[in-house]
């Protein structure tokens, strides 16, 4: 089975990210896939809420916290570097955390 990593940069919009994760999870309901999500937190000033949504179709969700706000492109670069150095994967998909990239297009 092919391993896919979804990279999502985030700054302060945790509600949108949780909604996106739930939508991705539903989208994967009929798939047989090995999909993990890596969220890059760009030094958000808002506290991350405790979300207990069930994401049973995702293998894992990992959050990497940046020490200082560096912007969207730096978050993507940091996430890609992490994936290439630490993860076993076949595909990488970068998605915006605000829902601009539709999970239906996965």
Name each region found by the language model.
Residues 13-28, 47:
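Short, well-formed alpha-helical segments that are part of the catalytic scaffolds
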Residues 52-86, 91:
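Conserved donor nucleotide-binding strand/loop of the catalytic core
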Residues 24, 79, 98:
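Residue-level signature of catalytic and energy-coupling elements of molecular machines
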Residues 33-44, 65-66:
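Short beta-strand/loop segment that forms part of the nucleotide-sugar
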Residues 48-49, 76, 104-106:
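Acidic donor-diphosphate engagement hotspot in glycosyltransferases and nucleotidyltransferases
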Residues 88-100:
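Short beta-strand-to-loop acidic/aromatic patch adjacent to the donor-nucleotide binding site
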Residues 3-5, 36:
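Cell-envelope/extracellular polymer assembly enzymes that use nucleotide-activated donors
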Residues 41-51, 99:
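A conserved acidic beta->alpha catalytic loop
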């Amino acid at each position: 089975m092919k391993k896919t990593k979804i990279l999502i940069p985030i700054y302060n919009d945790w509600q949108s990210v949780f909604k996106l994760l739930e939508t991705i999870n539903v989208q994967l309901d009929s798939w047989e896939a090995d999909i993990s999500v890596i969220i890059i937190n760009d030094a958000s000033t808002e506290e991350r809420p405790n979300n207990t949504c069930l994401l049973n179709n995702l293998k894992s969700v990992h959050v990497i916290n940046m020490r200082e706000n560096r912007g969207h492109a730096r978050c993507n670069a940091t996430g890609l570097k992490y994936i290439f150095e630490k993860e076993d994967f076949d595909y990488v998909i970068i998605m915006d955390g605000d829902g601009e990239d539709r999970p239906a297009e996965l």
